[in-house]
Amino acid sequence: VGSEMCIRDSYLAAVERLLKEENCKNLGVEADEVLVNEYEQMKQLGVDICLLDEDIMNLRIVKDSEEIAAMRKTIAITDDIYSKVIQHIKVGMTEYEISALVQYYSTASGAQQMSFDTIVSSGERTALPHGRPTGRRVKAHEPIMIDFGIQYDNYQSDMTRVCFIGEPE
């Protein structure tokens, strides 16, 4: 209501226009970020295409104090989320419910989004490294694996932990 959508250029048309305006002879791209069909279309633009994945990786590997602080904060928030979740796990809860707790505390903690789909498995299912949560109800004394991560301040975390309700058998 009260707005109008205006599509001026496609992504590749905008790239082509910019290359011409700036009289560019080279275009640097990250292979991991460009679809094959986009790459094939870029080859038709009449410029040399340089793959910059390694160069960008080398630049990103060096962290300044602000980046290190942001990473530490993201990990601290992740630790706090896990601590809150395990305080609420009870015998009879489903893996789905535990996964929902992870999502809830992540959102409540200010996470921009989850880094990946949360994995919760229990009992013999903990042997499945990428098992998705199910309606299986957790039992006392059995392992519960929780694998999750958040995106906070544009930094990702990834935590995998195994816990028990009571002492392991």
What are the roles of these predicted feature ranges?
Residues 20-23, 114, 126-155:
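Acidic/histidine-enriched ion/cofactor-binding microenvironments in catalytic or ligand-binding pockets
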Residues 157-169:
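Short, compositionally biased
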Residues 2-7:
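Short, small-residue-biased leader/transition segments that mark boundaries at the very start
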Residues 10-114, 168:
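Flexible, acidic/His-enriched mid-domain "rim/lid" segments that flank
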Residues 36, 153, 164:
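Conserved protein kinase catalytic core
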